[in-house]
Curated annotation (Swiss-Prot):
Associated disease: Combined oxidative phosphorylation deficiency 15: An autosomal recessive, mitochondrial, neurologic disorder characterized by features of Leigh syndrome and combined oxidative phosphorylation deficiency. Clinical features include mild global developmental delay, white matter abnormalities, ataxia, incoordination, speech and reading difficulties, T2-weighted hyperintensities in the basal ganglia, corpus callosum, and brainstem. Mitochondrial complex I deficiency, nuclear type 27: A form of mitochondrial complex I deficiency, the most common biochemical signature of mitochondrial disorders, a group of highly heterogeneous conditions characterized by defective oxidative phosphorylation, which collectively affects 1 in 5-10000 live births. Clinical disorders have variable severity, ranging from lethal neonatal disease to adult-onset neurodegenerative disorders.
Superkingdom, natural source: Eukaryota
Gene3D superfamilies per record: 3.40.50.12230
Organism: Homo sapiens (Human)
Protein name as catalogued: Methionyl-tRNA formyltransferase, mitochondrial
EC number: 2.1.2.9
Family to which this protein belongs: Belongs to the Fmt family.
Keyword Mitochondrion among UniProt keywords: yes
Cited CDD domains: FMT_core_Met-tRNA-FMT_N
Disulfide topology: none
Keyword Transferase annotated: yes
Alphabetical list of Pfam families matching this protein: Formyl_trans_C, Formyl_trans_N
Length: 389
């Protein structure tokens, strides 16, 4: 059903409402500061016309749910579904584009957003700040599926920082986009879940993507009511989750505990391998494992004073043991000039023959913290902090 109304940015008048007296839905949005008076053709209820913005695997799950809803003719939730994604150097494109093409959905590459008419926009892992002019094209605004319990972990990498900081509880927030600032709009729906012990960021993202997709469909089924009941984010508890840089992957053996190193590995290991120095050469640690108690009982590990970064090969378990601030971590494989197992690394660099005949100083035969050159990004950092305050 379509109705022609004179409105100020928000849902149409409720059925039976008197002219000149705004509906509860409109009043809720007006309190949130949206004003763009014009004549427009909008819908009071589903099916909705949706424009989806997304890029990665997390976003693809939300798009899959929207597509399934559009194909479900009995529920009549989605009438029209089109997609905006980012350009990619890969011919196949990003995961969202791949799914859109396979599903024969119209797809545009940013900044092209098409010229169709839509009721509501949906964003998931898009990575671009949407301007006010674009947001105001959607009668019901633009929703964001964000994988954290806002206001904790605003920004582009919430799942990574959830794992990196050892959070035990996380969740998904469906919020409404605001122009000029990231992740600060009103919360329409929020659900929490425990973080599975020792889960990687990739594994946690898969859990949250399914939860977020289900929550999105729930919000769309009652969109005007959800908007009317939206609540502002609290001021306290806001944290920022910046993108991960190569410098984050550099292990600080003297400063980081074994727990911190394992959290770092679970958070970013599948994106950027952890890095350190070996005899002035960068070495990547590919496969980290926890060290069991039987290995720790070895006299070689307890009978001498060790410097953080010291490396010992444990023959029985075929792993490299590396000493950090408070204990040991295990490494099964590394990348030097090529990929090496722990045994290969021992034979090439730790074997007594090599230690005897090498010109390397004993102090060099340990892992040392890699110091990458830092770029001056102070202005950008300040600007990003202002975006979330």
């Amino acid at each position: 059903m379509r109705v022609l109304v004179r409105r100020c940015w928000g849902p149409p008048l409720a059925h039976g409402a008197r002219r000149g007296r705004p509906s509860p839905q409109w009043r809720a949005l007006a309190r949130l500061g949206w004003e763009d008076c014009r004549d427009s053709r909008v819908r009071e209820k589903p099916p909705w016309r949706v424009l989806f913005f997304g890029t990665d695997q997390f976003a693809r799950e939300a798009l899959r749910a929207l597509h399934a809803a559009r194909e479900n003719k009995e529920e009549e939730l989605i009438d029209k579904l089109e997609v905006v994604t980012m350009p990619s150097p890969s011919p196949k494109g990003l995961p969202v584009k791949q799914y859109a093409v396979q599903s024969q959905l119209p797809v545009y590459e940013w900044p092209d957003v098409g010229s169709g008419e839509y009721d509501v926009g949906v964003v998931a892992s898009f990575g671009r700040l949407l301007n006010e002019a674009l947001i105001l094209k959607f009668p019901y605004g633009i929703l964001n599926v964000h994988p954290s319990c806002l206001p904790r972990w605003r920004g582009p990498a919430p799942v990574i920082h959830t794992v990196l900081h050892g959070d035990t509880v996380t969740g998904v927030t469906i919020m409404q986009i605001r122009p000029k600032r990231f992740d600060v709009g009103p919360i329409l729906k929020q659900e929490t879940v425990p973080v599975p012990p020792k889960s990687t960021a990739k594994e946690l993202e898969a859990v949250l993507s399914r939860l977020g997709a289900n929550m999105l469909i729930s919000v769309l089924k009652n969109l005007p009511e959800s908007l009317s009941n939206g609540r502002q984010q609290p001021m306290e508890g806001a944290t920022y989750a910046p993108k991960i840089s190569a410098g984050t992957s550099c292990i600080k053996w003297e400063e980081q505990t074994s727990e911190q190193i394992f959290r770092l590995y679970r958070a970013i290991g599948n994106i950027i391998p952890l890095q350190t120095l070996w005899m002035a050469n960068t070495i990547k640690l590919l496969d980290l494992v926890e060290v069991n108690s039987s290995v720790l009982a070895d006299p070689k590990l307890t009978g001498q004073a060790l410097i953080p970064g010291s490396v010992i090969y444990h023959k029985q378990s075929q792993i490299l043991l590396v000493y950090c601030k408070d204990g040991w971590i295990g490494v099964r494989s590394v990348m030097l000039k090529k990929s090496l197992t722990a045994t290969d690394f021992y034979n090439g660099y730790l074997h007594p023959w090599y230690q005897k005949n090498s010109q390397a100083q004993p102090s060099q035969c340990r892992f040392q913290t890699l110091r990458l050159p830092t770029k001056k990004k102070q202005k950008k950092t300040v600007a990003m902090q202002q975006c979330i305050e």
